[in-house]
Amino acid sequence: MRYPRDLQGYGATPPDAVWPDGARIAVQFVVNYEEGGENSVLHGDAASEAFLSEIVGASAWPGKRHWNMESIYDYGARAGFWRLHRLFTERDMPVTVYGVATALQRSPAQVATP
């Protein structure tokens, strides 16, 4: 049975892309905005976030807030986002945001920022 995904792509003969100013590569910056979209009893979830975290081996806390987990997400919204925004804005660099809808809904100041 043939594997259904194309993992070869163009192979050894990629198309001859012509980029502006003789550039040899194109880079796209993508920021994931998830802060406020994580599992939390505050959001009506049965337990705290356990999966999307830098806490190794984190487990959900049923019916309780996980203060360390919330702190990680809070930092992203309160400080991390603004640091990245300044860096990209100062350099006039375009950026793509992959945002969790509920996270964006809970962060109107970040969403309204040009």
Question: PLM ranges: what are they?
Answer:
Residues 1-114:
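Catalytic alpha-helical scaffold of carbohydrate-active enzymes acting on polysaccharides/glycoconjugates
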